[in-house]
Amino acid sequence: MGLKNQLRNLAEKRSSDFFGVAPVSRFKGAPKFHKPRDILPESKSVLSVGIKIPQGVRKANHRSFSKKGMRDAIFIYQMHGYVTINNKLNKTAYSLANFLENQGFVSTPIPASAPSNRKDLVGIFSNRHAAVAAGQANFGWNTLAITEEAGPRVRWVSVLTSADIHPDPLLKGDICDREDCNKCVEVCPVEAIPDTESVELTMEGKKFVYSNLIKERCRTGGVSGLSTRMAEQKLELPTNPGPEDYLKALDKESSWHKMERIASMCGRCIIECPVGS
């Protein structure tokens, strides 16, 4: 059995639904300090692993946001739509990296979540971009990695490695249909997803276009209580919030909202996307 199949089998044994490989050359357009070789100079390949959010967990999110719903159902989504999956992904990434290192290849597992730079709201490495680069997904207008099977309802993790592994091809065509769908723009409670302003990215000649997400509105809206289910407050959101506005919102946060905010994520652009099941 070849190395790639061994890695795929290891990922599948740990309940992973997606597995792909990308060469580091597909990340040449990444920002400085966020390329694979900025993190691991010896890296030649990037592994991308994904786990789907169960449909029942997705329904719990719907239930909590519906007018007649039970708002506490958001805790189900918080635990099993985020925490449980991210823990499984982190353990899988560690196992893959450890397996590769035992084969003589230097490898670095990337955390599944938690941005490393909270001021600029960016992580050390984009697991979403890795999923697209590894042929597992395409970008949606909501900036998320969209799969045909589950839409954006997949969480991802990556492993950088010095092993030169045969890559998967990029997906052909588009999965997100911007001509007939504008759902993510419509459902965003803080208008963080612009209707027309976009970002373009090219990998091996294929152009990807997605929205220029206003990350500060997305983040500050959650702290302000404008986009979350457990909101115990509703603070006014500035027109063009920046990092300092996010800090100001944290200072104004009520005690009840602060205690419940751990389960106060929004996720409308993930849950309401009509692609996949």
Task: Give short role names for the model-derived ranges.
Residues A30, Q78-S277:
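Catalytic cores of enzyme domains
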Residues M1-G81:
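Non-catalytic, usually N-terminal nucleic-acid engagement modules in DNA/RNA processing proteins
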